[in-house]
Amino acid sequence: MKVAVFPGSFDPITWGHIDLIKRSLAIFDKVVVLVAKNKSKKYLLSDIERFTLTKDVISSLNFLNVFVDSYSGFIVDYALINSIKFIVRGIRAFNDFDIEFERYLVNNKLNFKIDTIFLPSSAEHLYVRSDFVKELMRKKDVDLSHFVPELVFNRLKSKFIDK
C-alpha cells in the first residue's frame, strides 16, 4: 500500500488543500492529512481547532482512505514512525518551489528514504492561501466560497464577523 503524508498548518483548510488531497488520492492508496504544530508560527486557530476543523471538513467530503492526524515534530520523523515513504507538498508559484525544495533537501538529509512529491496547484486554486482567507474574513459580506468550504466559513465567522 502506497501511503503519503500531506502536512500543513491548515489555518484554515482551503479548497486548494482539498484539491491537493483529492489529487494525491489518484497517486496514493492512503493519504494522511497532517495538521502540523509549529511553535514558531502564530496561528489564528488553536491546535485543537485546526485539527477538528480539518477533520470535520475531510469527513464532510466523504473521502475514502484519507485520515487526519496532528504532530509537532519533524515531518520526516512522523513519516518514519508511521512507515510512510512519501511527503506531498503543494506548489503555487516559484517562491513556493524555492521554500519547498529547501525543505526537501533538509528532509532528505534527515532521512533519504522518504521522498517528497511536489504537486502544482490547479489553475483555479493558484491564488488560494489561508492568509488571504484570514485577511478577507475581516471584511463583512465577502464571498469566500472560492476559498473555503461553507463549514470553514461558518467556523471562522464566529472569530471575525460575530464579534
From Swiss-Prot:
Its EC number is 2.7.7.3. The record marks 17 as: Transition state stabilizer. GO terms for molecular function: ATP binding; pantetheine-phosphate adenylyltransferase activity. Pathway: Cofactor biosynthesis; coenzyme A biosynthesis; CoA from (R)-pantothenate: step 4/5. Reversibly transfers an adenylyl group from ATP to 4'-phosphopantetheine, yielding dephospho-CoA (dPCoA) and pyrophosphate. ATP binds at residues 9-10, 17, 90-92, 100, 125-131. This is Phosphopantetheine adenylyltransferase. GO terms for cellular component: cytoplasm. Belongs to the bacterial CoaD family. It comes from the Bacteria. The gene is coaD. It holds the Pfam family CTP_transf_like. HAMAP family: PPAT_bact (MF_00151). Substrate binds at residues 9, 41, 75, 89. Keywords: ATP-binding, Coenzyme A biosynthesis, Cytoplasm, Magnesium, Nucleotide-binding, Nucleotidyltransferase, Transferase. GO terms for biological process: coenzyme A biosynthetic process. Its cofactor is Mg(2+).
